[in-house]
Amino acid sequence: MKIHCQPCAQGPGAWAHAYGVLKTLHEASQPRLHTWVDSPEEADLILLCNPIQKQGDTSGAHPLRRRFPNKTFILHDDWKTPIRYPGIYANAPRGAFWKGRFRTASYALHHPDFKNPYVQAYQPAQGLPPERRDILFSFAGRNCHPVRERLFQLRFQRPDILVRDTSTFDAFKHSAEGKDPAQREYFELSLRCKYILCPRGVGPNSIRLFEALQLGIAPIILADAWIPPEGPDWEKFALFVKEGDVDRIEEIATAHEGEFIERGREALRAHEAFFAPHAYFNYLVSAADSIRRHRIIPESVMQASVRLGNGLRKLARKLPGGAA
């Protein structure tokens, strides 16, 4: 397919880091299934990235979304996203019509400053043999959701479970000052784990979930609203625990302890097939094409209905007795 990509804003001061990542991912894609084109008219699909700018959400005003509504898709990896237009979102909404207009992304388009460099540089040869994986599961993260708050309150019977509140650590700053020791510690701790716990945070998706796959470690997913990305057979490697069962997390992980080696292998296979740098551009295109083929209502019709509704509301305000 022919693919055209643009950041949602251009010029001095515009945020466009995801565009550069996309370009690199396309160049690295294996096999090279798709052609990068400069002409939106020529493209089969249009991918718009960095919708959130300093002035807020800019996706609605982008001219390509209006000109080519049925082949234009938003890419975004933030936690709190104004999800109005079809696309691939890290935190895609769960609802009656989610499958028709949205798919779930990883955090591959995150700004490089926000990624753990040790995880990004990981090679399978760095992995520890099973006998040195001495932690049943771990979680180190911010206290930013009730399910995490409950997790931090738990008292575990097993000494090989590590749960830490790291709310004082800010991974989402551009400066590297003070980040290296914590990032190295997180990486080294993860390598010792049989499972990595991935509770939801501000959004249902978790960066550490995809880090776990990259490290060949099976995730325990504690996020009822999370929509699994299409492609991987998640049941082969992930353990899903309902948020209401957080008190049973130790019991559930213990019951599956003997499966960690094979689940870890399957997790790494999923990463290599769908989320690794050589695979992710193809995954995004496949997800966008899936939306185009399966959505219930064409986007052009959705946009026309929104414009009609806005027009009727404006007219109603002008009529006698209408709202001022």
Briefly describe each language-model feature range.
Residues 218:
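Residue-level detector of anion-binding/catalytic polar loops
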Residues 240-261:
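C-terminal "capping" alpha-helix adjacent to the active site of nucleotide-linked donor transferases
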Residues 1-207, 215, 223-236, 256, ...:
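Nucleotide-sugar donor-binding catalytic core of glycosyltransferases
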